[in-house]
Amino acid sequence: MPVIPALGEAKGEVLPPGDTTTIIPLNWMLKSPPGHFGLLLLLSQQAKNGVMVLAGVTDPEYQDEISLLLHNEGHLKEVKMEGARLGLPGRAESLEHQVQSHLNMIAQSQRTFQKKDAGKAIILSKLTQEQKTKHCMFSLH
């Protein structure tokens, strides 16, 4: 199984139990090209312990040190983050590419749906391009 490169590693931080939030600095900066964004994710090991990223998206204008805002939903135990791989990079694709990809998926779904049930397809075909784009933008957040 390939090892996913991490952008940072926890240095002994502990997330106390009971809906607590901690900021973990990663000691690096990210410069995204225009129209791109950074997506910081945790591995499933942390998710199984009830840890989640509260703010994991960086925009191209943000130029300061990256930190992860982690939240421990686990009410029964503290989570030791030492050595945990943090800040895994997401796919570096432009926002425009993501929107176009979603629009293509909607168009394909619409064509498939029209073949299966022509009566209900009228509802989908009434969506304007603006509504489709708004739906896609919402699904990216």
Swiss-Prot record:
InterPro entries: dUTPase-like_sf (IPR036157). Belongs to the dUTPase family. One of its GO terms (molecular function) is magnesium ion binding. Coiled coil: none annotated. It comes from the Eukaryota. This is Putative inactive deoxyuridine 5'-triphosphate nucleotidohydrolase-like protein FLJ16323. One of its GO terms (biological process) is dUMP biosynthetic process. It comes from Homo sapiens.
